[in-house]
Design a protein with these regions (language model features):
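A short, well-ordered alpha-helix in the C-terminal region of glycosyltransferases
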Residues: 283-297
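Active-site and donor-binding regions of nucleotide-sugar-utilizing enzymes
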Residues: 1-94
Length: 311
């Protein structure tokens, strides 16, 4: 974002429970230009901390939980439910610029509007004759970096029970901290159609080649939307369920379930949903269309425009 906004100095500081005082942060900025702003993205800041910053400098806060009435100049909540959280009804935000909803999802450059893979998906959604959907593409499975419950492994084993699914290509995205990587690699050795991808740097490419994705709640859902990939979404953490449920409620994703509530049921429902979705071309097309309508890849650009307008 610094490259897009030469007039804006973004100081991204991961605060701890012993965070520096605002005065200490600002003192290190004294030699910089005066027409700058600070972008804060931390759960640890307090109302007092933000108020002190706001007195000295344009203060922007990234939020997703609405913990209290933040004394800031601009508030960004790019979640799909951001507009439903009631910020506008809070008198404390009367003079705060609010950037709410998925129009402001700041995706990485590979997912930005106009990128090659994204453009192909957009053409697909418009029915361009020269674009073919990834009907025989792989099934993408993404469950988070650590996947402590081995959801990917459980989903794969459930899928292998069905003739309609066991011959499909499966691409599992795994982080280096996954304690079950050995089990996944063992499955890949047993089934040549299972591929494990660690420390992925080409996520957009993997998504573009996917027929359907099985994904946990999180920012990956927005990336899948930008790529127009039909998705079956599930949750395994408390902060994921609202996001997943909102996607489902708006008809953008199919619901797999909540692992914390009933793990076996979530695994079975997700694979049952995959069987249904793979055989329903009309439903896949509808999910693609709604996904691309939600995320157009210009979120970072819109945030940049809003930030520059404050200078």
């Amino acid at each position: 974002m610094e490259a897009e906004l030469p007039g804006l100095l973004c100081i991204l500081q991961e605060l701890t429970q012993r965070a520096e005082l605002p005065e200490e942060v600002l003192s290190r900025m004294s030699s910089q230009r005066k027409d700058i702003a600070i972008l804060v993205d931390s759960y640890y800041v307090t109302e007092k901390y933000l108020a002190a910053l706001k007195k000295r400098i344009t203060t922007i806060y990234m939020d997703d939980i609405y913990a209290f009435s933040y004394p800031v100049d601009m508030l960004i909540n790019y979640n799909i439910y951001g507009e439903e959280m009631g910020y506008e009804k809070d008198a404390a935000f009367a003079d705060t610029k609010l950037l709410l909803g998925a129009n402001y999802v700041p995706l990485r450059e590979e997912f930005s509007a106009g990128a090659g893979y994204v453009q192909s998906r957009k053409e697909l959604s418009l029915g361009a004759a020269n674009v073919t959907p990834a009907e025989e593409g792989g099934i993408l499975i993404t469950t988070g970096g650590s996947d402590s419950f081995n959801l990917a492994g459980q989903l794969l084993m459930e899928a292998m029970k069905y003739d309609a699914l066991k011959e499909k290509e499966y691409h599992v995205v795994s982080g280096s901290l996954n304690p079950h990587i050995g089990e996944l690699q063992a499955l890949a050795k047993k089934h040549e159609n299972i591929h494990i991808h660690c420390n992925v740097t080409n996520m957009a490419e993997l998504m573009a080649e996917s027929e359907v994705a099985l994904s946990a709640g999180g920012s990956t859902l927005y990336e899948l939307c930008a790529m127009g990939v039909p998705v079956i979404a599930f949750s395994f953490a408390e902060n994921q369920e609202r996001l997943v449920q909102t996607f489902v409620k708006r008809g953008i994703a199919q619901y797999g379930g909540n692992y914390r509530t009933d793990g076996n049921k979530m695994i079975q429902n997700t694979i049952a949903g995959l069987r249904k979705l793979c055989g329903d071309e009309a439903l896949k097309t509808e999910y693609r269309r709604k996904a691309l309508q939600l995320v157009d890849g210009r979120g970072a650009e819109r945030i940049a425009e809003a930030l520059l307008s404050e200078q």
